[in-house]
Amino acid sequence: MAKTLYEKLFDAHVVFEAPNETPLLYIDRHLVHEVTSPQAFDGLRAHHRPVRQPGKTFATMDHNVSTQTKDINASGEMARIQMQELIKNCNEFGVELYDLNHPYQGIVHVMGPEQGVTLPGMTIVCGDSHTATHGAFGALAFGIGTSEVEHVLATQTLKQGRAKTMKIEVTGNAAPGITAKDIVLAIIGKTGSAGGTGHVVEFCGDAIRALSMEGRMTLCNMAIEMGAKAGLVAPDETTFNYVKGRLHAPKGSDFDDAVEYWKTLKTDDGATFDTVVTLRAEEIAPQVTWGTNPGQVISVTDIIPDPASFSDPVERASAEKALAYMGLQPGVPLTDVAIDKVFIGSCTNSRIEDLRAAAEVAKGRKVAPGVQALVVPGSGPVKAQAEAEGLDKIFIEAGFEWRLPGCSMCLAMNNDRLNPGERCASTSNRNFEGRQGRGGRTHLVSPAMAAAAAVTGRFADIRSIK
């Protein structure tokens, strides 16, 4: 029987399945950070259980860390406690930890792929909703809750029901300046923020194949923002070339053998999906969100929509509420909207390719008066590579702040945040109310679009920035 990639990955990891019961899956990799793990380790301790597979468990500090100093106290008392608990728990249970002083420290969904912890064909979980990022490698990766974190630590397994399947095909070739972030925002604009609910999404088509691994990670990272359980891209030569030689990747003949298996990880001809969505890449323009969920998104050349234009009463009410929170008026061109802050970073867009794209725009320009612009590399290795390429100097000369690795302004859990009423062009993944700080107004954009907003002081079409 012909199978989708998701069905192959799921079936290959079923440990036990009884009639009328939820299947039990084996978990190949468990990624851990400081926010969702303390109670899970406490549960192990209370029941005198060890971590079953410490060699398949990797921890880092990211959500709470300051990006201005490596002082564990800088982000407040709760952050300090969570980071100290992670140190204690990893030491006690034998889990490898990339702490603030480790050269590999960084955002968990940046660290995993760059260290070769993430490999095609794996099941990967983390107590973090954007674990879908790792699906870019043809791995079944999804976020879990703290009780499930404890279950995986104790058993290396997880009960998981089968999801529906969705195929999202992006045909043709994207125009110059159009990035994976624009593509995925356009997809969510079409499906809505709940369009993928109950599904695992496989992204395919010529425009997807043309993306780098960094671009594919951006794509899968935001699968959750359309309500999907996970996102997938079938592995290919781009994947294999990225993985080869990384710290935890197979070596020598083992790598060659692995590639032969990884080549089978694709949807069979004749396999059927529950839902199919198609977009044409050449029709996608630079995207900017205007509301308070990622599905409220338009082209940078469009005007703010009028809630009255929505036929669905729920969408209309949502648009009215979003515009009131965002302080926007219908009919105003996006390019007339001024910004206060710019954030380039997050598990969506903090990799070297993202920083290069932003630096290309920033080079020879200056951050607009009154705008604060942050560039936060996703990990120690990304920061080191960017500095070796001189990107830090480009940003600093242009007036951007060059920071230490961390989740930073993606979420208000550290000392990088918006003040009430401040408007931010952000390369992160969520524009919910208060996401970047109480009363903060978030617009999601690509790294190049964020840099363009920084130097012009408002949203600008990257295609017109020469």
Swiss-Prot record:
GO MF, one example: 4 iron, 4 sulfur cluster binding
Task: Please list the cofactors this protein needs.
Answer: [4Fe-4S] cluster
Give the residue range of the signal peptide. Answer: none
Q: How is the cofactor bound?
A: Binds 1 [4Fe-4S] cluster per subunit.
What does the record give as EC number? 4.2.1.33
Q: Pathway, according to UniProt?
A: Amino-acid biosynthesis; L-leucine biosynthesis; L-leucine from 3-methyl-2-oxobutanoate: step 2/4
- Kindly indicate whether the keyword Iron-sulfur belongs to this entry: yes
GO BP annotations listed: L-leucine biosynthetic process
UniProt entry tagged with the keyword Chloroplast: no
Write down the PROSITE patterns for this protein, in alphabetical order: ACONITASE_1, ACONITASE_2
- Record's CDD domains? IPMI (cd01583)
Q: Which UniProt keywords apply?
A: 4Fe-4S, Amino-acid biosynthesis, Branched-chain amino acid biosynthesis, Iron, Iron-sulfur, Leucine biosynthesis, Lyase, Metal-binding
- Residues the record lists as binding [4Fe-4S] cluster: C347, C407, C410
Q: What reactions does this protein catalyze?
A: (2R,3S)-3-isopropylmalate = (2S)-2-isopropylmalate
Q: Which NCBIfam families does the record match to this protein? A: leuC, PRK05478.1, PRK12466.1
Family of this protein: Belongs to the aconitase/IPM isomerase family. LeuC type 1 subfamily.
**Subunit comment for this entry?**
Heterodimer of LeuC and LeuD.
Outline what the protein does. Answer: Catalyzes the isomerization between 2-isopropylmalate and 3-isopropylmalate, via the formation of 2-isopropylmaleate.
Concerning PANTHER family, the annotation shows: 3-ISOPROPYLMALATE DEHYDRATASE (PTHR43822:SF9), HOMOACONITASE, MITOCHONDRIAL-RELATED (PTHR43822)
Its name, as the record gives it, is: 3-isopropylmalate dehydratase large subunit
Gene that produces this protein: leuC
